[in-house]
């Protein structure tokens, strides 16, 4: 528990940024549904919603492309994106014509995709090599959903709720800008070492190493294809369910912002706790069970011609949806560690989900409207077969030990058994059950650190501050702090601040 708390405390900025993205994305989607329902029929609301959400894919792709090919354009593009996001939200709020509502939704979702790509990448770089990745993802999603529910249920309808959305969008953009500029400010220092407060896992350090080996590169591609297909099948299930509930919301049968949405908070937190058990080896079977449970709500919508069981269907749907978001956020964050373009992959779960939503929504609305049970059963069987093949086909393949050889535990199922032969050389070790203080004392004794070096290491491994802030806290100059860090690196056999922090948390004392 102590180590988990330390990991979460170090990554609180990344958790908050991702939570703000979840809130603004969900709240923008809800606002668009409300506004577009004023101009079109209930069955058309979800069609327009899927198209608007699909526009976010553009933003999700733009940021990684800029990061790798036009890094000097990121600051200007981010500033423009922030302005466009706020302007689009205001346009969406004040529009009096359907064309303007659609335009506002398209621009807002595209800008949110840009912000979400950054938030997911920062989150993945922080938590991908930690044993609490799923719990961190669950915490972010739960926070975002909780803010949405409280805003919907506590704040007065209209301007107050809309003001909260705009303010949170501005806060999200400001936090992401602040994180990048702090990183650039530190990099300008001649003694700079990559900060754990920034993007602490570099593709050059991990992804490129895997892709230098042809066998590992091929295994990565197979694993990504398998994960993407699984996510597509799952997305189709939940997109069909979302289509049904959005239509019910448009006709006033249910309110998707009301108290049942709190079940998303509970289900996501439960998913995070379950998925992190035993090196995330229960993720696939857990997600499969959640998908089966959620499909029950689809059949409730189909067979309940009298419309009396919408609440029961909504509850079942939300219990599964929380698992799904935590699943694809965690999976792609872990997989990104092995990618050469590591900035590109963390948001791919959301991209696949939105693309599948565009493709599945219209057929799902047709099936639900016709109440065709046979068509629903046929579609469900196809989805279940695909999910079983892609998720449950790996259960006999264990790669936990191999995945642990390069530091902290990674999920076996994140990349499957294919990558096991190509991991690095050291033998796997069992993680010791130590508190942070016990680990620190043992580390200091083993590597012969001085008392001052101990104080510095204690701050270094739990702080998300910049080098300048840490130096100020310890009453040291930057150059003196760098000399101490260099000395600790030399004694521990590490090459950088990031490597030292990762080594500290993965290190196990010898008896």
Tell me the role of every PLM-derived stretch.
Residues 1-2, 129-130, 145-232:
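Intracellular loop-helix junctions on the cytosolic face of multi-pass helical membrane proteins
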Residues 113-127, 323-338:
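Intracellular juxtamembrane helix-capping segments at the cytosolic ends
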Residues 2-55, 226-252:
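Helix-loop boundary and gating motifs at the non-cytosolic
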Residues 412-483, 491, 502-511:
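Helix-turn-helix DNA-binding segment
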């Amino acid at each position: 528990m102590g180590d988990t708390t330390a990991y979460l405390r170090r990554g609180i900025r990344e958790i908050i940024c991702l939570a703000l993205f979840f809130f603004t994305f969900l709240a923008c989607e809800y606002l668009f549904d409300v506004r577009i329902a004023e101009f079109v029929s209930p069955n058309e609301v979800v069609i327009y919603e899927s198209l608007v959400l699909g526009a976010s894919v553009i933003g999700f792709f733009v940021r990684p492309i800029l990061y790798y090919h036009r890094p000097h354009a990121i600051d200007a593009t981010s500033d423009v994106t922030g302005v466009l996001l706020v302007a689009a939200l205001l346009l969406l709020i004040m529009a009096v014509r359907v064309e303007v509502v659609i335009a506002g939704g398209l621009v807002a979702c595209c800008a949110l995709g840009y912000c979400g790509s950054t938030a997911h990448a920062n989150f993945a770089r922080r938590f991908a090599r930690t044993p609490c990745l799923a719990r961190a993802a669950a915490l972010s999603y739960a926070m975002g959903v909780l803010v949405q529910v409280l805003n919907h249920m506590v704040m007065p309808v209209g301007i107050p709720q809309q003001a909260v959305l705009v303010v949170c969008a501005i806060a999200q953009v400001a936090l992401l800008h602040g994180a990048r500029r702090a990183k650039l400010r530190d990099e300008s220092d001649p003694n700079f070492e990559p900060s754990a407060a920034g993007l602490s896992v570099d593709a050059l350090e991990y992804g490129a190493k895997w892709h230098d080996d042809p066998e590992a590169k091929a295994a990565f591609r197979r694993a990504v294809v398998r994960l993407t297909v699984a996510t597509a099948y799952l997305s189709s299930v939940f997109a069909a369910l979302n289509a049904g509930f959005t239509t019910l919301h448009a006709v006033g049968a249910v309110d998707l912002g009301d108290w049942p949405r709190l079940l998303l908070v509970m289900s996501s937190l439960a998913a995070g706790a379950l998925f992190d058990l035993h090196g995330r080896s229960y993720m696939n079977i857990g997600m499969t069970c959640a998908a089966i449970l959620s499909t029950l709500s689809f059949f409730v919508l189909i067979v309940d011609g009298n419309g009396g069981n919408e609440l029961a269907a909504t509850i079942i749907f939300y219990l599964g949806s929380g698992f799904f978001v935590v699943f694809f956020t965690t999976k792609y964050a872990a997989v990104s560690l092995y990618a050469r373009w590591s900035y590109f992959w963390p948001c791919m779960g959301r991209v696949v989900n939105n693309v599948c939503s565009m493709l599945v929504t219209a057929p799902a609305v047709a099936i639900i409207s016709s109440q065709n049970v046979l068509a629903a059963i046929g579609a469900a069987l196809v989805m279940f077969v695909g999910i079983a093949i892609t998720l449950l086909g790996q259960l006999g393949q264990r790669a936990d030990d191999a995945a642990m050889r390069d530091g902290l535990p990674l999920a076996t199922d994140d990349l499957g058994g294919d990558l096991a032969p190509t991991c690095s050389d050291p033998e796997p070790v069992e993680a010791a059950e130590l508190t942070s203080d016990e680990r620190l004392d043992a580390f200091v004794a083993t590597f012969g650190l001085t008392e001052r070096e101990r104080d510095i290491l204690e701050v270094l491994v739990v702080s998300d501050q910049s080098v300048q802030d840490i130096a100020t806290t310890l009453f040291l100059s930057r150059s003196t702090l760098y000399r101490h860090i260099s000395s600790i690196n030399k004694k521990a056999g590490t090459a950088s601040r990031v490597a030292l922090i990762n080594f500290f948390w993965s290190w196990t004392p010898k008896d």
